[in-house]
Amino acid sequence: MQVLPPGSTGGPSRLFILRPVATTLLMAAMLLAGIIGYRFLPVAALPEVDYPTIQVVTLYPGASPDVMTSAVTAPLERQFGQMSGLKQMSSQSSGGASVVTLQFQLTLPLDVAEQEVQAAINAATNLLPSDLPNPPIYSKVNPADPPIMTLAVTSNAVPMTQVEGMVETRVAQKISQVSGVGLVTLAGGQRPAVRVKLNAQAIAALGLTSETIRTAITGANVNSAKGSLDGPERAVTLSANDQMQSADEYRRLIIAYKNGAPVRLGDVATVEQGAENSWLGAWANKAPAIVMNVQRQPGANIIATADSIRQMLPQLTESLPKSVKVTVLSDRTTNIRASVRDTQFELMLAIALVVMIIYLFLRNIPATIIPGVAVPLSLIGTFAVMVFLDFSINNLTLMALTIATGFVVDDAIVVIENISRYIEKGEKPLAAALKGAGEIGFTIISLTFSLIAVLIPLLFMGDIVGRLFREFAVTLAVAILISAVVSLTLTPMMCARMLSQQSLRKQNRFSRACERLFDRVIASYGRGLAKVLNHPWLTLSVAFATLLLSVMLWIVIPKGFFPVQDNGIIQGTLQAPQSSSYASMAQRQHQVAERILQDPAVQSLTTFVGVDGANPTLNSARLQINLKSLDERDDRVQQVISRLQTAVATIPGVALYLQPTQDLTIDTQVSRTQYQFTLRATTLDALSHWAPKLLNALQSLPQLSEVSSDWQDRGLAAWVNVDRDSASRLGISMADVDNALYNAFGQRLISTIYTQANQYRVVLEHNTANKPGLAALETIRLTGNDGGTIPLSAIASIKQRFTPLSINHLDQFPVTTFSFNVPEGYSLGDAVQAILNTERTLALPADITTQFQGSTLAFQAALGNTVWLIVAAVVAMYIVLGVLYESFIHPITILSTLPTAGVGALLALMIAGSELDIIAIIGIILLIGIVKKNAIMMIDFALAAEREQGMYPRDAIFQACLLRFRPILMTTLAALLGALPLMLSTGVGAELRRPLGIAMVGGLLVSQILTLFTTPVIYLLFDRLSLYVKSRFPRHKEEA
């Protein structure tokens, strides 16, 4: 047994140094736990930060936006408005469709929200129209969240109506049962139905009306209970042929007798097998298709959900005819996996670069192996804690681990360097390990807890940004904490067993050259430091100038919210004149599709026209453009968007709005562009007055581009003005008028056909082919008192006027949303400020309110909290350092290094043309924790020299700077190289990672140069200040 020299206690490391087997087994257990934990970690693009969101859709075919608002949306909103935990309620009421989107507080569980929504729908049932075809349907999905998967179902042989029937029952229902799927929608509107198109002239000639025929059809097709017979011995169930299943059966239906002869439905109408809604259509690459969009539930694991769907697809498609093809057009998980793979590669590259730096400085394989073991062990051990906390492998947690490679190696470097120094002086490895580890233990603890203190404010950030970065902060903190444990246990134990004087002194030509280079660098630094200490006020002026410069740069740098990602999918809205019909929109989308599919970067395209829960108005179309992978195309998504908009711009009568899909979705409605701003009023009249004025003002701002509004009040409407007195005299009620109009022009669902697998509808309408437009109203006839038919024109006049195409509400008040993008050369911060200035210039009345929405609102909140976040990080670190050093002064000396990091980060971002967004701000906060390490290592050794060797402060800090120069340079370069792969990232999701790397590399480069000189000067300044205070207050000195 070795005899240990006095004082070689080893501190907290002693037990682990003296018991190598136990230490090895403990570390092996941690490694095994991490490996097992990694296998259970789900993969995602970002941490799950979705607001609990529920969408309620109510369809009422034929109803105008006014009717949908007053009869359907308003009663539902009144009930929903009473729910607790509701954050925001928005609605869209358009022709035949009402969509209410409910966004709840982040803290409310989605299941609880679902129960409240169901209760509210039940309470509103008696307030809704009695002839609603279906009750309101809710789904746990955010409509603004892009589909996780889009599938196109096409066939050259089978009609689309039959295809939808098969897909709905055999495919869509099964996919909707997959865990994590929130909603499966079939875009295309080809749901099978029997369509009855009345011939107005024929029914008028026979003295019939549409209401008579509707009543006859409804009475002829029933499916109700009939009872049973219960005899002494047998029970018999009653059944009848009360159901009609095919168009041919309806065609033969007798609807009346005239002069003793039967009048069959086929005599007065065209009866055919068709689609339930003839004003809906979808296309995949210009071919008619049923487009299946799969959306996930908020909080669901997107990778696991997509994998489950892909596994069951082969089995589901086998149940379809061979002529029916199912094609996966887009799968968001493809890019998510690619992004995660790229980040994992950057993590491995960062580890390799860090180990290379260690070898370059230590030039010794055993000494390089020790931290080379500590880095992966600390990172892998973090996985075990991540599983326990329900985290995932995503871009942010992997970024945290990549950055952590530079952090976790710092502790090991500091320990190894200190132990090596004693071994080189001639002490035995075990004694050197105990002495070096004991001496450096407090420094390791100071470094660790002061760095974790910087991350604490991130945990208390509010709303969605705080939830987003919680996994990042905790993952990084856990890795740093494990690193400290490894550095105080495994690292000194390995040093005691693997290092020796012979191994450390063994040098080759490369080692000797590096040693001479380092010696010259240290000598040059020593000469420069001596000059700086002789001219302290000049150095202090530089330090003060960096503080002022950092404030100035903070003010002028362009500010953004979240990097715009290239995920390979573009969402689009095609806008046409407000009076556009379905047929004209279908033709326009074909022209647009032709241009888009010619672009070399486009892989596939889906388009949708018509009004349903996803598309609010008939004059708009939805597009999803799927791009080729980044490896197969030369341009990024923004360049592709510009090229597509240029190609479509020459098509008359259309405006195309495009935006790339993002992993982070905060909005609750699909918008035309990236950012939204709302104008809310108490009445529609006030909204119609101010909306055009604000739109014109916003369109004139250079800070905004592609400004548009969803306020559309120039749709054409036929106003039927009934003379109530004349109608009453003839025995015609307003209900008769509404029914006649609904029967003719509402695609009215009048009956249900029940099959073994599904239910289909019978649709009633007038055949308007011979009399299109307003002329079709001349064919409407009603039944009078005497049983005769009376034309509508006898009791009503028809006028054409303008009407809103949709009526939108925000928290029950009328609202319009302005969508905009930010042109090149401006930032989101510039755009927000310009909008606020315009609002003040217009002097809006008190009953008109404005508000940013979605990511713009989150940007405002984040921008307001950023300064406080940085202040909180600095204060938290000051408190921790003050407690550790038992001093009010020394923490200030350490924190004086921070402005240099801010200057470097902000300058680097501006040079790179990057905005100061949330990711970059996180990088600056991390820099606060990194750059103070230099000061801590200097001050720790200076204080120890003053205390133990009785050195003067100037000599102590000068010696500490020279002694710690090499570990300071090593740790800074390790942190810099850990961030370098992020800065140089070019793969999928690089937009998300690059700002963090740029901020950290820039901050580290500038701070490394400046703090080596400013910290000693500031240390001596505060030392003199402390002596001055003690001289002025002798009592304090005596107490000391």
Swiss-Prot record:
What is stated as this protein's family in its record?
Belongs to the resistance-nodulation-cell division (RND) (TC 2.A.6) family. MdtB subfamily.
Q: What is this protein called?
A: Multidrug resistance protein MdtB
Give the NCBIfam families listed for this entry: PRK10503.1 (NF007798), RND_permease_2 (NF033617)
Topology with respect to the bilayer: Multi-pass membrane protein
**Entry-linked SUPFAM superfamilies:** Multidrug efflux transporter AcrB pore domain, PN1, PN2, PC1 and PC2 subdomains, Multidrug efflux transporter AcrB TolC docking domain, DN and DC subdomains, Multidrug efflux transporter AcrB transmembrane domain
What InterPro entries has UniProt attached to this entry?
AcrB_DN_DC_subdom, Acrflvin-R, Multidrug-R_MdtB
Q: Where in the cell is it found?
A: Cell inner membrane
What Gene3D superfamilies does its record include?
Answer: Multidrug efflux transporter AcrB pore domain, Multidrug efflux transporter AcrB pore domain like, Multidrug efflux transporter AcrB TolC docking domain, DN and DC subdomains, Multidrug efflux transporter AcrB transmembrane domain
Location (main, coarse): membrane
Q: From the UniProt record, list the coiled-coil ranges.
A: none
- What Gene Ontology terms describe where this protein resides (cellular component)? plasma membrane
Transmembrane domains' residue ranges: 25-45, 347-367, 369-389, 396-416, 440-460, 472-492, 537-557, 869-889, 890-910, 911-931, 968-988, 998-1018
